[in-house]
Each structure stands twice: as structure tokens, then as C-alpha cells.
């Protein structure tokens, strides 16, 4: 069994599979992805594979630079997006927006 390249919390699985979540915002530890990468995706909770995605772009961003468009791409409101990021990365201020496309 191949290892997964990236994981998402289970609550995001349906949105990824339906194409409603088209970006992910990560900290520096996951800023190495690049456009064209094909990634196996697993659930964070159990590492179970659930799809394959392609990275379309990777760009730096701060919490204050997040817009309604980013929130829409995450399938949530802007205030909710900022709260989710602060909860996942409480001590970080610089992030990377990874634009993704579902492959299968």
C-alpha cells in the first residue's frame, strides 16, 4: 500500500470529492508542494486514502490577506476560515495557499 502524500481532516472529505474545496491553506512545513504534483490524499484521523489530487499552484499568504474568495474556495465563510486556521496553526502567521484539482 502506498503512503499518502497529504492528509485532510475527515470533515473536508466530502467537499474535496464534490469539488467544493479547491484550495488548502498550510503552514511552512507543507510549503514544498509545487504545481503539477499529483498527490495521494488520506484522512488525517486514520490515514485512509480517499482520492488523488493535482496541485495547480502554491502561493504565500498571511491570515490578514485572506479574502472571501479564499473562503469560497474552502467552502466556508471568511470568519470561519480564519478561525479554523487559527485553531489548526495557533502560533503561525505565514501560510501557503495550495490550489488543488480532484483527479480521481
From Swiss-Prot:
Key words of the record: Hydrolase
Keyword check for Hydrolase: yes
GO CC annotation: cytosol
Biological role: Catalyzes the hydrolysis of N(4)-acetylcytidine (ac4C).
Catalytic activity: N(4)-acetylcytidine + H2O = cytidine + acetate + H(+); N(4)-acetyl-2'-deoxycytidine + H2O = 2'-deoxycytidine + acetate + H(+); N(4)-acetylcytosine + H2O = cytosine + acetate + H(+)
Record-stated family: Belongs to the N(4)-acetylcytidine amidohydrolase family.
Protein name in the entry: N(4)-acetylcytidine amidohydrolase
Active-site residue numbers: 21, 24, 74
Gene Ontology molecular function, alphabetical: hydrolase activity, acting on carbon-nitrogen (but not peptide) bonds, in linear amidines; N4-acetylcytidine amidohydrolase activity
Keyword Hydrolase in annotation: yes
EC number: 3.5.1.135
